[in-house]
């Protein structure tokens, strides 16, 4: 028997799938949106940009922008009670519209 691999994108077949109407690149407004330090964002992984995508466990998490590194944003979020720092580009972020 062959040993199963447990790579970085393991178990993401349905999670990172795009529906037919969503295929292709995202809109420009998502890429050009400027986040400021302190803004809340939702981590929404875009499967067309592989190299800057966060791990699948952060899909749908809400975090706070704590810094900027070049084009990328430093996001602080929690996994349970642990504070985690994620560095990712705006392709994988959406502004949080909910309460404070």
Swiss-Prot record:
An example Gene Ontology CC term for this record: cytosolic large ribosomal subunit
Keyword Ribonucleoprotein: yes
GO MF: structural constituent of ribosome
Keywords noted in UniProt: Ribonucleoprotein, Ribosomal protein
Biological process, per Gene Ontology: translation
PROSITE patterns noted in UniProt: RIBOSOMAL_L21E
Domain of life: Archaea
Cited InterPro entries: Ribosomal_eL21, Ribosomal_eL21_arc, Ribosomal_eL21_CS, Ribosomal_eL21_sf, Translation_prot_SH3-like_sf
Pfam family, one: Ribosomal_L21e
Family membership: Belongs to the eukaryotic ribosomal protein eL21 family.
Protein name as annotated: Large ribosomal subunit protein eL21
Source organism: Pyrobaculum aerophilum (strain ATCC 51768 / DSM 7523 / JCM 9630 / CIP 104966 / NBRC 100827 / IM2)
Gene that this sequence comes from: rpl21e
């Amino acid at each position: 028997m062959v040993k199963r691999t447990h790579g970085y994108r393991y178990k993401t077949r349905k999670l990172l799938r795009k529906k037919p109407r969503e295929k292709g690149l995202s809109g420009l407004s998502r890429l050009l949106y400027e986040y400021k330090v302190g803004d809340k964002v939702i981590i929404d992984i875009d499967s067309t940009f592989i190299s800057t995508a966060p791990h699948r466990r952060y899909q749908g998490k809400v975090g706070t922008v704590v810094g900027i590194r070049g084009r990328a944003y430093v996001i602080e979020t929690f996994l349970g009670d642990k504070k985690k720092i994620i560095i990712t580009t705006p392709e994988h972020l959406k502004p949080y519209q909910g309460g404070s």
